[in-house]
Amino acid sequence: MAQSGMTQEGPPGITRPVVFPPFKPDAPDCSRPAGLRKSLTFAQDNGRKFMQGVARGLELAAKDRGLTYEIDQANNDPAVMTAQVRKFVSSSGGALVISPVDSQSISPAIKQAIWSGAYVGAIVPPPATSLLNAPQYLTGKVLGDEAADYINTRLKGMAKVVLLTHDQLQFLAPRFAAIRDSLKEIPGVTIVADISPLTVDEAGGAATMRTVLLAEPDIDVVLGADTVVLGALAALRETGKARPDQFLGGIDGEPAAVAEIKSGGPYKASVSLASPIFAYAMGQHAADWLEGKNVPQAMDILPRSLTLQNIAGYEADVADPGSVYKDPVLRASYLRMYGNICFDSRENFVDFPWSSERK
């Protein structure tokens, strides 16, 4: 039996990995979900800047499409997030975008939302009506190759490297496999720490870096998600161990990382997964779903390395994601969409760890 106030059990979705064809935007319309609010809710794991970008993109899309918009932030608490998603279902919410704190514990509640007929867009882990991911190996390779080039050209092929990983989130593992692959080609590279911070935020990165510096005070390269690498930079500065010739590089294109790159200090690169742009697209898809239209089953946000040379154009794009979405050529430089699903075919929701890199 379903819990009180929740929908009944439904179909299991697609549980075995498949390769989705390209999205067909001209597919015939379906039924509109009945009895659901014209609402968009963002179930947010925490307040890091990357997720603030998601929130902004969703809010802009909701405004453009006439949806009410709500944010439920879980502050890294899986139980709180589960309660928030249950509340979404019991209040007949129309569309949910979620960045799960713990994908396993939240999965049953997300399925209830899917079975209710709502649009559910998930950022990386399943289940979801429409799943957002990045080509994770390529994302890591872009950063790893930038770091390797810097080590070879600026550090004479010698570097002590710290990798701040996300081992608790298996879907991101290919990022770090790619970074290791890029670095292993350089004989003079020593990875002195390969470790997951307890929390994926600046505080977690700073705490981990302080521990690393006790054993290895002279670090040349730090790589990971922007938010934890920014924390590592703070720890380097507070201990007097930051140097202009270091290479700190991250993934996510967070505003603080972009500002650090512009300043010309140790932070040299950020691989952008432009969160306002993919979030705006998810918000548009949510509105399309509620109007009985087809949406993608999966979508890639394509990685791009930010440099001093291209940051201005990138900042203009993320400031106005609506204009990016309306321009097919510009949109295709950021987003790639796969598969088709609508209210009538919602039993085909995604419940496997989808990646466009799976062949």
State each model region's role.
Residues 1-359:
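A residue-level marker of the well-folded mature domains of exported/periplasmic proteins
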